[in-house]
Amino acid sequence: MTIKRFFALAFALVVLFLAEAQSIVDNPVAPSEAIVISGNARFTVLTPEMIRIEYSENARFEDRATFTVLNRKLDVPAFTKSEDDTFLYIETSNLKLKYRKGTDPRTVPASANNLKVVVSNHGVPSVWYPGKPDPQNLKGTCRTLDGLMGESKRSEMENGLVSRSGWAVIDDAWTATRSDGGSSYALVYNNEVGYSWWAPRADEHAMDTYLLGYGDNYKKAVSDYTKIAGKIPLPPDYVFGYWYSKYASYSAQDYRNIMADLKTNKIPTDVMILDMDWHWNGNDYSQSAGRGGWTGWSWNTNLLPDPKGLLAEMHSKNFKTALNLHPADGINEVESPEYFSQMRNDLNGKYLEGNTIKWSLDYTDFTKSFFRNIIRDHESEGVDFWWLDWQQYLTSPYTKALSETFWCNHVFFNEATKRADHRPVIFHRWGGLGSHRYQIGFSGDAHISYEALAFEPYFTATASNVGYGYWGHDLGGHAYTNDELVNNPNLVLRWIQFGVFTPIFRTHATADGRIERRIWKFPNFPTILEAVRLRYSLFPYIYTMARKAYDTGLSICRPLYYEYPEQDEAYTYDGEYFFGDDILVAPITTKSGTNGMTEKEVWFPEGQWWSVDTHELIQGPCKRTLSYTDEQIPYFFRQGAIIPYNPETVMNVTERPDRMILNVVSGANGEGTLYEDDGDNPDYASKYAVINFAQACEGQTGRYVISSRKGTVGRAPVNRSYQLRIFNTPTPLSATVNGQSATYSYDPNKKCTTVEVPYGSCSVDRTVIVKYSETLSTDIVSAKADKMKIVYERNSKKLKGSFDRTKKKVALEISNSMGKTVLRNTYSNVNSFTEDLTNLFPQLYIGKVVADNQTYVRKFIKN
């Protein structure tokens, strides 16, 4: 592809980005053209890979939204319908449904007698029927990591929307139990509160199943799920900064000291959390209204005599604020006499039990009074958002099978939409499918251990399989069982370094004075601070990926198998993940050796990956054992990527600096995007801007273009300068910006060319051209990984492999797409091999070659 054609394509992506970003109006009623009714069964073809299957003895089908599904009005895909005396047939390009007319699709025991669907995955069929177990499901998430000890929570994780079986199901029937024991109610707009409210289902005994037959196209499965279940809202910008949080009986002076220490130590911070001791009864069991003082609504004026003034002071220092809530026991007269009196009068004594108005959020009158008298009052004092911790019942004691966790999230988030000029955001527990609409998750009280840390990378990325893309963890761990690890500097450092590459960056611990979370108190604070600064550098990239999550349903943290579904290592190396489109992360979750080094085995997928801390380009697919100092983090940029960074001077992610750093990995054509908006504007769906970046390599010339800003945004700077950091380059000979000579330099140790792009208008394209002393490499700079080719020749039906040097031992394994091995062979002292595949059945295969402990994988279609 020529440079000119490449840039024409790259800039077309801006238009595509803008087009994809338009908001969708949810409509739970499917187009009639998508519906097929056969007696008491109804089938709705939503996409070529997704079909809704309903069965109701009274043909009472559900056309309203539910807790899980909001929108069924999608473009009708092409499908055919036919029938004979016995069966109804529906066929799309990916699904073949066969239904025995007049029967309940559900059989006991589960079988394909009455209904089966054949799913096509690269031409390989897989059969689903109602009730079929799915041991290959790739899982989603779970409600809490409370008590996490290593792998202890893996067995609690719910099924996700993707599976190596090629299919997954959403059981949205009333009879299906959600994560906290509740059921999926209908949602109907309620004029009293101004948003959707729970309602009984049309038929509580009906079958309501969504079959997702996406094969290994996992990204499309998750993306299409958000088309029916609602988008992942874009949080306000400040939530992506550092949160200071600790469960402690902090006084107002303690908070002032913490803010002063953060400033003195130059620690970028955006959020200050006030845990439960902000209210009465936090530790005073003698005044407890119920469960040890967890619930409270009135300021503890012994600790915080002027809460409004304190919050104003926090705001003046650029901290956003959140209060912790445990709604459990309602509003107690002793703890909150003023609020109690106001609500008792509002409700005419309703919900009163003794001296407590019981927690009754499933009723609109209680909800209106509660938010008007308590929540709005605190918000007027300066509370920016709420942390919904947990002590309430799993399900409502008043409304059968109403999930308290999900319903709290739904109500608090929708109430937050009423705040003018602010984006709704809450910090909460997972409440089952549909919870992604309420953004930020609080994962809970993990134990302080390397084993708990090691589980969290897998847990965070896997949650994307249900669209739950904003888990926030207790970085450093919550409570301890091992005295040696209470304030272990290495463990805290590695947890924070992992946190840099997670959606929410928040340290926390329980109310134990022995546990320290003031990071400036640790002996390795300078190294910890470097991690915090890296987080702030990454903000433009993170925020751009957050916008992409809103537009596409793809979370920031994603499993490797989204991109490499045919490669077994993408599943087995589950401590690695993608952080957005272009960064591969393999966090260190083990303690350092006595020499201060830590070894980490990393699997690199196909492609080439720039090791940011070791300054080398690594050719995948391969496995490498790498050594890291405490200061280093295993993260890697995809070759061709352009990743925007903030300058190191930024102290708040709410800043919009007029200087930006672009990290460019040379050697391949590529592009990147910078998303910009006002940070907290609720109209971000339409009010935003993008700047596109592109690079093209041709011979000894690198061409790098910064496009003009497209779109509307108020807070972004009109003018900006850039610094290009171009990695994997030979020595530069010259550099120009829009034809004018530019300042440049070269670091041979980092193989990095730096070019300064002068301060100028963001409404003008800027083209940087760099001439190099040698041809720009599209291969590895480091020679530590060997190159290999695997080619399937269609004419001869032979698979051929070749290496760049002789291999002592080579093992070949060929499997079909279902994972069944169909051929194995080994070779010794070879630099090539050939296998005749004439006898193999025509279909997709995966060839895996292990040569002297390096692994290579290729997929091919046998003709």
Residue ranges and their predicted role:
Residues 1-26:
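Bacterial Sec-dependent N-terminal signal peptides
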Residues 6, 17-20, 776-863:
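C-terminal outer-membrane/trafficking sorting elements
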Residues 43, 51-53, 90-97, 584-587, ...:
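Short, well-ordered beta-strand segments enriched in hydrophobic/aromatic residues
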Residues 47-85:
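A low-complexity, Ser/Thr/Gly/Pro-enriched, surface-exposed linker/loop concept
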Residues 65-78, 611-630, 734-757:
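Solvent-exposed beta-strand/loop surfaces of large extracellular or lumenal domains
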Residues 82-236, 246, 259-264, 626-647, ...:
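Catalytic and substrate-binding clefts that recognize carbohydrates or anionic sugar/phosphate headgroups
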Residues 120, 128, 268-528, 563-565, ...:
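Aromatic- and carboxylate-enriched substrate-binding clefts and catalytic-loop regions
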Residues 413-414, 433-441, 455-456, 463-473, ...:
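Catalytic core of carbohydrate-active enzymes
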